[in-house]
Amino acid sequence: MTSVEKSDSGECGTPFVVVNIDDVGMCHGANKAYLELRRLGAVDSGSVMVPCPWFPEIAEAGALKPDLNVGIHLTLTSEKRHYRWRPLTKATPASGLIDSDGFMWRSVAELRRNAHPDAVEAEMRAQIETFLAAGLIPSHVDGHMGGVFAPEFVDRYVALSLEFKLPTLFPATIEAYGPKHNLGAVDQDSYASAAERLLNAGEKLATKALETPWHRNQPALERYQDLYHQIEPGLNFLCLHANAAGEIEAIEPDSAQIRIDEYELLKDPSFLDWADSLSLRRGSLRDARATSR
């Protein structure tokens, strides 16, 4: 595996891979895992949930270390049972952004049924501006649980990405997006139109966005070797969810161990050696953009 500095990310036979950790900023364990994995060179970037309680911790680390490679994980839902967050925009019920308890909706389906696109755009803008105001240099922008790719909001996502000149995660087709199961029915025409707008602006679309394997039916090594074997030529974005043990067991009891397994595997020297033996190029979305223009 070679770094982006040693080769470009243009169209060729060798896949370009962004090993990305989602949900940074959600809790201390997410930050701890990302900081260690980034220090080890095991990952290329992390997607930060700005509305979450532990955003200030990762913001402080990123402001001190510009090469931390953190991006904006635009967050429009709050799915945990007891550990939840609210919009930065202090939205009212009329916005459709919040449930009866004042938190973001638990699912993308509820978000789509209730949220006004103008309110969604205002919230996404607030998250981007808060991230930038913290002194962070964005490696990219993407979306938590895929909410930004819903047909009601995808044009707003693209418009803000272009306005702020952010390297943008956008799969070439919605079928190439691993977490698409969160979305429900998607209007292919609106998605294709948004993709074309990004292409015309010079952005590179992802061939695949692969997600954490949310099961423990195999040993962790086999699960992640299977995941890596799904990588294809072109730009691949791995939406991983590594988390150190501690709070996550209470926050997300049903799948906490999957996140912990992922963290332990990604820092395991034998897995790192195996991954390094693959014919892949690595870097952030910002790296991919810089080397493909």
UniProtKB/Swiss-Prot annotation:
| Keyword set includes Magnesium | yes
State if Hydrolase is listed as a keyword: yes
Q: Which EC numbers characterise this protein's activity in its record?
A: 3.5.1.-
Q: What is the lineage of its organism?
A: Bacteria, Pseudomonadati, Pseudomonadota, Alphaproteobacteria, Hyphomicrobiales
* Required cofactor names: Mg(2+)
* A single GO BP: carbohydrate metabolic process
The job of this chain, per UniProt, is described as:
Probably catalyzes the deacetylation of acetylated carbohydrates an important step in the degradation of oligosaccharides.
GO molecular function: any one?
deacetylase activity
Q: Which family does it belong to?
A: Belongs to the YdjC deacetylase family.
Concerning Gene3D superfamilies, the annotation shows: Glycoside hydrolase/deacetylase (3.20.20.370)
**Alphabetical list of InterPro entries matching this protein:** Glyco_hydro/deAcase_b/a-brl, YdjC-like
Residues that bind Mg(2+), according to the entry? H73, H144
Name the keywords, alphabetized: Carbohydrate metabolism, Hydrolase, Magnesium, Metal-binding
Record-given protein name: Carbohydrate deacetylase
Q: One Pfam family for this entry, by name?
A: YdjC
